[in-house]
Amino acid sequence: PTGGQQVAALPSAGATVRELYDAGQSQLQRQDYAGAEQTFRQIIQSSPNDRLIADATFMLGESLFLRQNYSDAAASFLEVSTKYQNSARAPEALLRLGQSLAGLGEKETACATFQEVDRKYPRTASSVRQAVEREQKRVGC
């Protein structure tokens, strides 16, 4: 997309955190990962105590992961899984942290991280557990 289209998709300067978050989600869906990164960073910097901060931090990690920026993605997912460990995003953040570590060639650490998902979140959604199992096989844990 051209720069004009990206600008048009962003909410106004006075947008609420929810509006910014929704805009970032839309950017991800359109595969505008750099734009999504910028939007989620804006939320994190401007509203660090908002209830959507764990989600915004997770989605920042997604925008980085999808561009194979595994190191920065890992940092975002680690933050969600430690600082916001009780958030709904935490189990999936641990999964994505493991995937990021695998992308960095850190197989042992990735495998240990995958094991943490079930240990820390035994009641997590079956879709997350199944994804962990797939990743463990893919990585060779």
Cite the ranges covered by each PLM segment.
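Acidic, proline-/serine-/threonine-rich low-complexity intrinsically disordered segments
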Residues: P1-A23
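Short solvent-exposed coil/turn linkers within tandem alpha-helical repeat scaffolds
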Residues: S46-L52, K83-R89, R119-Q130
